[in-house]
């Protein structure tokens, strides 16, 4: 643990004894006497009436076989949701012998956690994301934080947009430079309701006075501008971030994007706004924006892509490595990344399921040899073939294809057309925009035919950004078979396309 710019940063990826402890703390239990694994478990069952992460100092020495037996009991216990970290004489002497100020916390976690049960992964994007698990995205984070950086952030579900915004807030808000940062979730809110919620959040954060609460963006931006001119209680930089902003942006089009123009007017070295969403509506409606002579096309966009192999590998292996889990070879890692489509949220889901498998017959591991826990092809298939896991993967990939449903549902239509083309003539080269239009004409999909080639091309680019499609120089294929399999066989694809004949909504 170390402080930088007034904030605490943790050197290990374990939230239980890192960021979670900032609010929840943790319990320290000191035990003397002769304690074998069974006696220890009896004691932990008794104190577990108050569920809390716990460090146990045991004034005794455990043999390796006892330690491994204790590890199995902890991991298989169904009632423990928190971490019990055991430090006995052997481990304590080891840490003392190899003491290093910069490495001691990492060393403790890496030596004790393989013998504990710990679940650090949070695949649900709506939940609080532990900063210790934040992986890669350094350039994207800087563009969000910088006064001269991006204003419009977009990308699909499970790609970590909310985690990026919250990481920016954590690094900026209340730092030693007198900066503030606020994240406001405006999911499903139109511009008046969004203004109300933003003003309330700024009041709650002590940035604006209670009298500043309003539902008018013109009034709200004047309040913000005056607040930044206050020299008695200065804010040297305010970063305002709106998450889940698709409906907000869409509603702004009815009044020529006036709220976004108002925010743009007060943007300076002391203030920046960021709007995150799943779909770049301003770029998609470029003609409308240009025709209204609005300077929004000059706002810098930032696309959040799925991970590349190095980032995906780090997220998959780093925290698990502290828990004593190793992968048999690079092929095993590649299979997992492909199955999860390189989506950070799905990679975390796999890690979560891998750890949960320990609670069922120790995931088939031999107690006398573990830890370490080597993930073999057998363990890989056990998780990947689990019906519950695959259903969750299907649901989350389905969400990705329907992420623009409120703006027309074009992703799903295009995906179905490319699947139809695949079943007609399998081709690694892919399918062109002209071929996509041809199928749309055949099936009378008016919703897609009303779009210009430029707009369809924009959608294809976005689907490539989401790693749904791959671009082969102007022709498009599914990036992985996961999405094609999600859509079904040729008959199922044809039946789904039939739902879009004419102007009808999906059945």
Where are each of the predicted segments found?
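Conserved catalytic segments around the Walker B and adjacent sensor/switch elements
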Residues: 54-57, 174-190
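Conserved NTP-binding/hydrolysis module of P-loop NTPases
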Residues: 181-212
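P-loop NTPase Walker A phosphate-binding motif
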Residues: 153-183
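Conserved P-loop NTPase "ATPase switch" module shared by AAA+ and STAND
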Residues: 13-38, 54-63, 227-256, 479
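Walker A/P-loop-proximal flanking segment of P-loop NTPase domains
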Residues: 104-156, 167, 171
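Conserved small helical "lid"/interfacial subdomain of P-loop NTPases
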Residues: 302-332, 350
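Conserved Walker B catalytic segment
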Residues: 39-47, 67-78, 218-281, 285-295, ...
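Winged-helix-like regulatory helical subdomains adjacent to P-loop NTPase cores
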Residues: 129-136, 170, 329, 342, ...
